[in-house]
Amino acid sequence: VTDRAEQKNSSVPEGIWIMRQTWNDVLFAHWPVDASNLRAMIPPVLELDTYNGQAWISMLPFMLTNLRARFLPAIPGARAFPELNLRTYVTYKGKPGIYFFSLDADHRLAVLGARTFFHLPYFYADMKAEKNGDGIDYVSKRRGDGEAAFRAAYRPISAPFTAEEDSLDYWLTERYRLYTTYRNKLYYEDIHHHPWLLQHAEAEFSVNTVAEAHDISLPDSDPLLHYAKKQDVLFWPLRQWR
C-alpha cells in the first residue's frame, strides 16, 4: 500500500488518505442469493451488482489492527479488535463498490466514531478471535440483539494466489469503494490496498444468524470461501455524491 496519494497510479484515489488499518486472518464467506429479494434491501439510488446475473452476500470476520487516523493521536485501546462485516455488491453510475448491511466490532469508541463520522451501520458486539493451529476460532454476539450472533472455525487450505481479472473471485474481493446513505443523501468512501493474496479455505459455522437479523435468508448450500492472511488498507475521506 502506498503512503503517498500523489503517486502516479490510476488505482490510487485522488487527494490525501486519512486513516490506515491492517486486516488480519480474513475469512470471505460468499453466498449466492436471490437478486429480486436483495434489491429491495439496498437504497434505491444504488444498482445491485451481479455476476452473470447472480447476486451475492458476503460475511467477513477478521482481526483489525494498526488502526490510526492520519494527523491524529492513536485511539485509546483501538490498536486491535475483531470486526465482522455483512455486505453485498452494488454500483453507482458504473462504479462498483460495496454496500454494508452491518459491521460488528468489539470496540465501543470505534463503533461510535464510525457511525458518527462515516454514517456506517456499525454495532457494538462481544467478540473474540483466537488462533487455533493454522486456523481461527471466531465468536461474535451483538450487544442488545441476541439474534445477531456468529461462531465459526476457519483455516486456509491452499497455497496463496491472486484472483484472475473477470473471475468470480476477483469480482467478490477486489472492491475499492463503499457506499452508504445518510438523510437521503448518497456518500462514498474510497480505499486502497494491494491486490488480495487469497487462499482457498474451509470453515465450520456453528452459529450464523447475523444475516437473518437483517431479514436476509442465506441458502442452505455451502458458501464459497476465501482466506487472506493480512492486508494493509488506506482510507480516503467520506464524500457526498453531488
Predicted features along the sequence, with ranges:
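Short, surface-exposed linear patches
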Residues: D49-G53, F71, F81, A110-L112, ...
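A glycine-rich, hydrophobic loop/mini-helix early in the fold
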Residues: Y51-I57, L64-D104
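Internal, well-folded beta-alpha domain core
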Residues: V26, N85-R242
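Short, surface-exposed, charge-dense and proline/glycine-enriched linear segments
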Residues: T2-Q7, I75-R87, A129-G135
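Hydrophobic, proline/glycine-rich low-complexity stretches
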Residues: V1-R70, E212, I216-S217, L224-R242
